[in-house]
Amino acid sequence: MAEGSQSAPEAGNDMGNDDAIGGNVSKYIVLPTGYCGQPKKGHLIFDACFESGNLGRVDQVSEFEYDLFIRPDTCNPRFRVWFNFTVENVKESQRVIFNIVNFSKTKSLYRDGMAPMVKSTSRPKWQRLPPKNVYYYRCPDHRKNYVMSFAFCFDREEDIYQFAYCYPYTYTRFQHYLDSLQKRNMDYFFREQLGQSVQQRKLDLLTITSPDNLREGAEQKVVFITGRVHPGETPSSFVCQGIIDFLVSQHPIACVLREYLVFKIAPMLNPDGVYLGNYRCSLMGFDLNRHWLDPSPWVHPTLHGVKQLIVQMYNDPKTSLEFYIDIHAHSTMMNGFMYGNIFEDEERFQRQAIFPKLLCQNAEDFSYSSTSFNRDAVKAGTGRRFLGGLLDHTSYCYTLEVSFYSYIISGTTAAVPYTEEAYMKLGRNVARTFLDYYRLNPVVEKVAIPMPRLRNKEIEVQRRKEKSPPYKHPLLRGPASNYPNSKGDKKSSVNHKDPSTPF
């Protein structure tokens, strides 16, 4: 959750000394008590020593049940939400229950039907587990902390299975994406390195606009967008990519926006935290979104660099910083929505509500009713609050939140789980909304994004998919009663609002 605050007594589940966790597990083999010799098929091997991985400890409870401990953020034991690990050396038809036992938050979308993500080497596309096999409850065996348990059936012995809290989006993937954009040699796309993280990873800054807007002495209307200040909030990167993809496209709306506006985008403010698999903090254990007031060039170098640039633009008489949008993901609420500021100037406050209202009209997954405006003292160090107080009355600062789980279409009660594409679609709709805000509609007709033309072979494949039902993982073919009971699941019930998605 982007702007949520957890004081020490309310930090969530307790983690006692017996739960002390160091780094990630590395090819950790779980052997039965008293067993000697080489591991056999079915003796699971856990690993999280890879980019954005997180799993700190594994305890075998029984032949089929395992307690899994999230590794806390580096240098900060308070935050334990993100997990991302692999399991191999499985046996065909082996059924297991995994219990994530040390979440630092008590409130969770797991209560509403959210489920972990899974993929395997032979099925590399991420999918959500069936909600009917996921349980979220207070567990007496873990000091009545909240535990998330899920049942799973391994079906292919040669596969390596990967489980994650949400769709991963790594630093390396991000760099490859920017490299691919740079190779296109677009005269309206500019990439520069604004600075480096503590571990010397790049702080990329993108500028997307018509070259005419960058000529010396040209006046600029700037929209500044940041993302991934909290590394575990991976939907932020997908939304940001959707914004970028749309702005660099040849869509008529994108062409008009580039002529009228200058988009400055810093898509990954916390590259070290992303790489390390942290949920909220940087390498040194700082929540960067609480240090906008006085960021250190040594401790918070990426934040320091972005703040310096924004202040420099603010002081430039030729530059009008119109918008600042910081993109996050939310762990307890549905839909996309925004946080804004409260101002003494009533007219400015009312004008601030225009953009989210327009976005609500353009994006079915964005909720204006969930959008709120505040000046809570504990949020003073956030980008939204700090810049809202620094910039003048013509500037508007928002936190854009998007659910880790799903959105509810207006007029219905059904929860639609987010996909990578759905997150990126929200990003495209954010970009399109600037056309409405600046009333540029007469310049270009509002048209839907054209569908890509398919070759004959692709058309035939698509037709077959439409005629035949999708492949179902064996996990979905049997009733939930086939799975062994998890500790405490008899007392727990989950109100699942969405249909299960096949793996």
From Swiss-Prot:
The lineage of its organism: Eukaryota, Metazoa, Chordata, Craniata, Vertebrata. Residues 167-438 form the Peptidase M14 domain. Its EC number is 3.4.17.24. Metallocarboxypeptidase that mediates protein deglutamylation of tubulin and non-tubulin target proteins. Catalyzes the removal of polyglutamate side chains present on the gamma-carboxyl group of glutamate residues within the C-terminal tail of tubulin protein. Specifically cleaves tubulin long-side-chains, while it is not able to remove the branching point glutamate. Also catalyzes the removal of polyglutamate residues from the carboxy-terminus of non-tubulin proteins such as MYLK. Its cofactor is Zn(2+). It comes from the Eukaryota. Belongs to the peptidase M14 family. It is found in: Cytoplasm, Cytosol; Cytoplasm, Cytoskeleton, Microtubule organizing center, Centrosome, Centriole; Golgi apparatus; Cytoplasm, Cytoskeleton, Cilium basal body. This is Cytosolic carboxypeptidase 6. InterPro entries: Cytosolic_carboxypeptidase, Pepdidase_M14_N, Peptidase_M14. Binds 1 zinc ion per subunit. GO terms for molecular function: metallocarboxypeptidase activity; tubulin binding; zinc ion binding.
